[in-house]
């Protein structure tokens, strides 16, 4: 027998793996899952993130959720920075309603949110929501995203 055994070499796309071992299959339905469990096969479940309706939910973070799902250690959730919280506080206190500064509750009603979420954002603990950040930028006239956080969104025009 030579070093090059031509009988054992199989090249091509139609070459089967051989053996009668169990193949990997996708189970669709509860009855097929129960049958696989009864047979004693190894069952692995994987969640398919952002499958069909990604256009309707642009905020879905599929890659991050997969990374969180596969990691063994605790992954800290994304939050807004303390700098954003300080900018929100400063801009909110600068806006006067009557003779008092704007409260968190008044800001929340103008941004179509709750006072608790505004408080989380001001502490720097809130989960970033682009829609809410856009509303806050519009109401407070302050940039909360990008490089120049805290700067006025639209500069006041000087009167001539």
Curated annotation (Swiss-Prot):
Cited InterPro entries: Cro/C1-type_HTH, Lambda_DNA-bd_dom_sf, MBF1_N
PROSITE patterns per the UniProt record, alphabetical: HTH_CROC1
Superkingdom field: Eukaryota
Keyword set, alphabetical order: Activator, DNA-binding, Transcription, Transcription regulation
Pfam families per record: HTH_3, MBF1
Cellular component terms per the entry's GO annotation: nucleus
Residue range(s) of DNA binding per entry: 104-123
Domain HTH cro/C1-type: 88-147
SMART domains recorded: HTH_XRE (SM00530)
Molecular function GO terms recorded: DNA binding
Family of the protein in this entry: Belongs to the MBF1 family.
Record function comment: Transcriptional coactivator that stimulates GCN4-dependent transcriptional activity by bridging the DNA-binding region of GCN4 and TBP (SPT15), thereby recruiting TBP to GCN4-bound promoters. Involved in induction of the ribosome quality control (RQC) pathway; a pathway that degrades nascent peptide chains during problematic translation. Required to prevent stalled ribosomes from frameshifting.
Protein name, entry field: Multiprotein-bridging factor 1
Species the sequence originates in: Neurospora crassa (strain ATCC 24698 / 74-OR23-1A / CBS 708.71 / DSM 1257 / FGSC 987)
Gene: mbf-1
